Regions:
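Intrinsically disordered, low-complexity terminal regulatory regions
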Residues: 1-86, 93-166
Length: 166
């Protein structure tokens, strides 16, 4: 599925709103600090937001928070799980590489993907992944958003991700 770095290619008003916030908080060459995340300012976006933290060596992504809409649509709460522990229903979507790209570039990455629905058929959604600092200069966290374009959804509307067996 396609990914891009130019926010102008986004169709999602929610992804664009988070991009506007990110640019306003950081500026053209500065990654915003996690302390700038104000839930009241981002209230309309919160159900679709994910916050993840970075482990640097080796590079790993651990989800700290997942919005209620993401849980409702995906059928799984990935809070507390590492990305590499999860089995995506989108084998062609290299999520780990997307986060690594954002980590290295210190810039947002946008994209769209298609996932299977539990009842058959597919759902398209758009996403944005944005880097955050936490007091220093290193990228320590990510704030991401998934826009399901008005999909009402119930639990397991799309095929859920699964935690890998150990």
């Amino acid at each position: 599925m396609p990914v891009w770095t130019d926010a102008a290619q986004c169709k999602s008003t929610m992804v664009l709103a988070l991009n506007d916030w990110w640019c306003r908080m950081g500026g053209p060459s500065i990654v915003p600090d996690r302390s700038a995340v104000d839930p009241l300012e981002l209230k309309a976006l919160l159900p679709n937001i994910l916050i993840a933290e970075v482990e640097h060596d080796p590079f790993r992504v651990r989800y700290r928070l997942q919005g209620t809409k993401v849980t409702e649509i995906t059928g799984i709460d990935i809070t507390g799980h590492y990305l590499d522990e999860l089995l995506s229903v989108e084998p062609d979507q290299p999520w780990q590489e997307h986060y690594l790209t954002v980590y290295r570039s210190r810039r947002p990455l946008f994209g769209s993907t298609t996932v299977p629905r539990s009842a058959g058929g597919t759902v398209d959604y758009e996403f944005g992944i944005f880097p955050l600092r936490r007091g220093g200069d290193l990228v320590e966290q990510f704030i991401a958003l998934e826009d399901y374009f008005g999909l009402l959804g119930t639990i397991e509307q799309i095929e859920p991700w699964r935690v890998r067996s150990r």
